[in-house]
């Protein structure tokens, strides 16, 4: 069993430096950063749940093609954004060395056409985030493979890619906002805006100053 190191703070309080599954100990600062990234990731994915539970009223709304972005549907953007989270989490759930490619994705999945399937998929990813993130070092190295269209290999970290997955999802939520607008669907005012934008505006919405 892993032992837990306890650091004494100036105030006399104690803060555990918890070991990850591979034995690497996390400092207080790293634990805080991981908690913040986890909060952002789960909040962004929860926005998708809110969309599915409270904004969409039929499965057909998932598959209507945008007039402004040919080929785009709400369902496709939900699936694509979720893919980046699951690919990253699956990557760091395997033994090291970590190798990640965002180009290995599933298409035409049930969540693209079914609100219930999409809801289940998003809920599963939120649960996976909560299970995996606390046990991985923020600076855990991974090799990223990408097609740009040239084959590229570069070095990154788990923390950087977790941040990217959240920002990437917000980008796709903004496109969902456009498609929803075409269909006359009303969305929460914070849906599809970057966290930095919400913080700048001082909004009380999710990911604004009141939440971070």
Question: Which stretches of residues belong to each language-model region?
Answer:
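Short, helix-capping/interhelical loops that line the mouth of catalytic, cofactor-
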Residues: 2-32, 83-131, 138-151, 185-212
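Alpha-helical transition-metal enzyme core signature, strongest for iron centers
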Residues: 41-48, 74-88, 115-129, 165-176
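Individual transmembrane alpha-helices with interfacial aromatic-anchor signatures
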Residues: 154-167
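A cross-kingdom marker of C-terminal helix-rich interaction/assembly modules
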Residues: 12-59, 89, 177
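Short conserved catalytic/interaction loops centered on acidic-Pro-aromatic/His motifs
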Residues: 173-191
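Substrate-binding/catalytic groove segments of enzymes
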Residues: 134-137, 172
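Helix-loop segments that flank and shape redox-cofactor active sites
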Residues: 47-73, 89-110, 147-157
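Non-transmembrane, amphipathic alpha-helical segments
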Residues: 29, 33-36, 40, 66-73, ...
């Amino acid at each position: 069993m892993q032992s837990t190191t306890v650091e004494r703070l100036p105030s006399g309080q104690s803060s555990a430096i918890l070991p990850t599954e591979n034995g690497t100990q996390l400092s207080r600062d790293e634990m805080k950063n991981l908690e913040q990234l986890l909060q952002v990731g789960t909040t962004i994915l929860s926005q998708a749940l809110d969309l599915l539970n409270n904004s969409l009223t039929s499965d057909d709304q998932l598959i209507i093609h945008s007039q402004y972005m040919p080929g785009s549907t709400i369902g496709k953007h939900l699936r694509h954004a979720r893919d980046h989270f699951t690919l990253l989490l699956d990557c760091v759930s395997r033994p090291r060395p970590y190798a990640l490619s965002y180009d290995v994705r599933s298409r035409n999945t049930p969540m693209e056409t079914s609100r219930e399937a999409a809801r289940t998929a998003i809920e599963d990813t939120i649960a996976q985030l909560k299970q995996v993130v606390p046990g991985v070092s923020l600076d855990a190295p991974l090799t990223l493979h990408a097609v740009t269209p040239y084959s590229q290999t570069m070095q990154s970290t788990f923390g950087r890619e977790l941040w990217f997955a959240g920002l990437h999802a917000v980008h796709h939520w903004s496109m969902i906002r456009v498609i929803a607008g075409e269909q006359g669907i009303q969305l929460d005012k914070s849906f599809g805006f970057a966290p930095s934008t919400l913080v700048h505006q001082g909004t009380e919405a999710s990911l604004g100053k009141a939440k971070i």
